[in-house]
Amino acid sequence: MSRFIKGMDLSTLLELERCGAKYYDHGKERDILDIMRDYDVDTIRLRLWNDPYSETGEPYGAGCNDLAETIAIGKKVSDAGFGVLLNFHYSDFWADPGKQIKPKAWKDFDADQLEQAVYEFTGDSLRKVLEAGVNVTMIQVGNEVTNGLLWPEGLKPNYDNIARFISSGIRACRAVKPEIPLMIHLDNGGNNEMYRDWFDHYMERGEDFDYIGLSYYPFWHGTLQMLEDNMNDMAARYGKELIVAEVSMGYTMEDYKQYEKLKDSERKGYATKPELVAKIEYPMTVQGQADFTKDFLNRVAHVRDNKGPVSYTHLRAH
């Protein structure tokens, strides 16, 4: 029987603690993990980058989620009673549909070498994470691999290599601990045509897996109805469980320049641009965020055939 998972990505937890971050619940300062638990969060998503440092050893930031940092966060949240969704990016920094850059150590590898490197890195990392006592309850093999991974060898439409690389990670996970469920994750959760095309190609070539993961950002990915329709179709077409691995809705249009310590040339502007806000069905307010979240949870909880009531909601703070 499917269960409904509520999750939060806390990959920057320790970095923010080192920066002095504080968290509040109705105006009262509290520990972030206590807040999450009291609001029924049960799973913490943690990304893993291969080598998030420059050639001179400077950290890239954004959590600096190498294996040591990921284990440290994973142990902390596991000790607090949470499960961990371990998210392999197979890159030294952010991997998403716009960039899937090979790790520096793999930059000259051909497809055969990449396949082997994925297997070894995945298996070795997972063993160390588990040996440290991290409660891994799910694994994500690649991050938003809509356009492939490990470019250029794994760039869409080279589905043969895409399937090779993902399948290598899947085999490594199964070899270490076969009972941990595995997810393949794409972005653009409202785009049914894209999901059908991608998974039709993969199913012809790749290793079996357990969950289809989706990202859904209303500014880019269509309406909630489009998300629901796509999830229903994925459940019927492939018989997989479904997880919304990333979702976000802001609550303010305030320009945060006054809070940043950046030069004007380094700023990216508003958290959410006005032209994007105009595309969504909810106002960018505290109540609008609450209404969106309630409607989102209600829709993903009622996907057909008992495949959809599983949702990892990555409620990103903006």
PLM segments and residue spans:
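Aromatic-lined substrate-binding rim segments of carbohydrate-active enzymes
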Residues: D31-Y39, R45-F93, Y159-V176, M231, ...
